[in-house]
Amino acid sequence: MTTTPTGLHAPDAVVRFEVRDGHTALVTLDRPEARNAVNEAVAKALESIVDATEADPRIRAVVLASSHPDVFSAGADLKEIAAGRRAGLRTERGGFAGLVFARRDKPWIAAVDGKALAGGCELVLACDMVVASARASFGLPEVLRGLIAAAGGLYRLPRALPPNIALEMIATALPIDGERAHRFGFVNRLVESQHVLEEALALAAQIAGNAPVAVRESLRVARAALDLDEQSLRRCGVDGMAIAAASEDYLEGPRAFIEKRPPRWTGR
């Protein structure tokens, strides 16, 4: 049975959670009146969702979207900061928004059709893949306010873009649009605005159709490639293969191929 995080179906919920097609979690930021700015309620909700999706064997991919027609997220709620409640915008385990530093194995896909700025951009950078429209925009304007992008943006952006482009964005506070982000490889799939969520869910479905253990271990090694030396990565790869080979799905793939049928993945 799919685990549903508590409190996300209340009328005043700031983050919505639903399961699509049995294997994809759709997470929707829903503070349109505040341009989906992150407050304590958002941070707690996202951390709860990370915990629930990681614990649920049915969930194989997560899509992070927005209910606002023009904004993905404006980042930190400055009213909360001005009121002395900055600490509430992060959680001990997940960091800013309960997500950017969260330990997780399952892939997250950001569906962006609008502005993803400051902490909103850092939410996108915390995801594994991005589906966006040409009118989407990504930026770290913190220096305009005497701040820095301390929720991962300053080191994740240079990994996601050519370093000189990232440095320009950080130093000038100027954003780039979805088309340019796609050209640089930051955006995986560029589609018309009305198809962003649909395409993100389709990408999630493609991932969910593969062997869950193999996807998890493959992504674990691929993510580690950004931080580890080659020798450590080899060990990481060997460990991942051992885990995949010990799973029930390891033999199911070849059997399904030989029997000319779709594989029946168990995730075990």
PLM region spans:
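An acidic, glycine-rich surface segment that forms the CoA-thioester-binding/catalytic face
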Residues: 45-47, 51, 78-116, 145, ...
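Short beta-strand->loop
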Residues: 228-233
